[in-house]
């Protein structure tokens, strides 16, 4: 998330920087924006759900951002963002529907393809955790250019498989806003407007994982990585 935030903030003009930065996020984009904005000496405000993990809210504040909390079940972060934008004139940097965010996150894909080449790997299925699709679409673009035999597959938690279903139907599907998941960082209502055409063109069929599979993967990561 820091890659995308830093990329987007670096692309701002001096006039845009003077207006300050506004973002909305469940936690990771929030921290990326806060850190990148502080590094550029730009004030930032981040809209976060009140039920986001406390550590993410606290860290976002510690990294320098002002945090505005909202009720994700009864309020729209987009509407809150639009109102704050009109009031203060801040520049809104979306968590995935921003070309510079996608480009920044795509650098992870460039590193993956470069490291794979060094290891002699020229064909693989690349599984990418997916919410709105910023990271996944960025990696997919990088692979399409530099590792054409890599198959990028979005991976989503059960109950929030909007991208997987959207790739099947060919149109943007939505999730039930009343559901919950261990994977709070990738709980999004639907694929991004900018990201979905990229996902549709460059990604292969996605995968859906259960809460039990998520916990098992976390345990393996702690034990072996």
List each language-model region with its residue ranges.
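PLP-dependent amino-acid enzyme catalytic core
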Residues: 2-225
């Amino acid at each position: 998330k820091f890659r995308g935030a830093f990329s987007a903030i670096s692309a701002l003009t001096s006039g845009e920087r003077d207006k300050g930065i506004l973002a909305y996020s469940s936690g990771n984009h929030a921290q990326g924006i806060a850190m990148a904005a502080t590094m550029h000496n730009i004030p930032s405000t981040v809209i976060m759900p009140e039920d986001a993990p406390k550590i993410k809210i606290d860290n976002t504040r510690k990294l320098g951002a002002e945090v505005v909390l909202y009720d994700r079940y009864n309020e729209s972060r987009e509407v809150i963002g639009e109102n704050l934008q009109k009031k203060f004139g801040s520049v809104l940097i979306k968590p995935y529907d921003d070309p510079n965010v996608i480009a920044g996150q795509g650098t992870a894909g460039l590193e993956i393809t470069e490291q794979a080449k060094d290891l002699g790997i020229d064909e693989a299925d690349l599984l990418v955790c997916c919410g709105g699709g910023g990271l996944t679409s960025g990696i997919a673009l990088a692979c399409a250019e530099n590792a054409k035999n890599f198959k990028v597959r979005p991976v989503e938690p059960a109950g929030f498989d909007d991208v997987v279903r959207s790739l099947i139907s060919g149109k943007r599907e939505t999730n039930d806003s009343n559901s919950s998941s261990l994977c709070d960082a990738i709980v999004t209502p639907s694929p991004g407007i900018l990201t979905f055409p990229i996902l549709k063109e460059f990604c292969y069929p996605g995968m859906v994982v259960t809460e039990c599979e998520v916990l098992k993967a976390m345990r393996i990561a702690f034990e072996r990585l």
